[in-house]
C-alpha cells in the first residue's frame, strides 16, 4: 500500500549567475526537479532511507547540484506510538 510522504529538499549550488542576470534560464528549474522527484517515487520502496538515498543521488547527478539535503517524513508511521512521524534526513 502506498503511504503519504512529506519530503523537504535543500539544493546547494552556485547561484551567482542567476543572481546577477535575473534570468530564469541561469538557475535551477524547480518545476523540472519536482517532476523528476514524482517520477522517481513511482517505484516501490521498502524504506524511507532508500527513498532519500535514491532522490539524493539522482537529483544531484541530473541537475549538477553541489550538495543536497533531504528529509523524508512518513506522517502515519508511528501515530499509535504517539509520534507525529518517522523520518530520515541525509546530506550528500
What is each of the regions a protein language model found here?
Residues 1-92:
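N-terminal, polar/charged subdomain of small-to-medium soluble alpha/beta proteins
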Amino acid at each position: 500500500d502506498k503511504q503519504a510522504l512529506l519530503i523537504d529538499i535543500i539544493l546547494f549550488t552556485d547561484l551567482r549567475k542567476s543572481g546577477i542576470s535575473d534570468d530564469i534560464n541561469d538557475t535551477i528549474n524547480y518545476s523540472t526537479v519536482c517532476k523528476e522527484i514524482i517520477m522517481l517515487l513511482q517505484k516501490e520502496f521498502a524504506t524511507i532511507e532508500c527513498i532519500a538515498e535514491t532522490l539524493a543521488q539522482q537529483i544531484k547527478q541530473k541537475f549538477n547540484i553541489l550538495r543536497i539535503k533531504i528529509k523524508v517524513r512518513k506522517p502515519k508511521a508511528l501515530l499509535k506510538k504517539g509520534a507525529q512521524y518517522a523520518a530520515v534526513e541525509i546530506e550528500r
